Amino acid sequence: MLVGMTEMVN
């Protein structure tokens, strides 16, 4: 979940 969110912001 957190990894997916950060990936989107990246």
Swiss-Prot record:
Keywords: Stress response. This is 34 kDa protein. Induction: By salt stress and heat shock. It comes from the Bacteria.
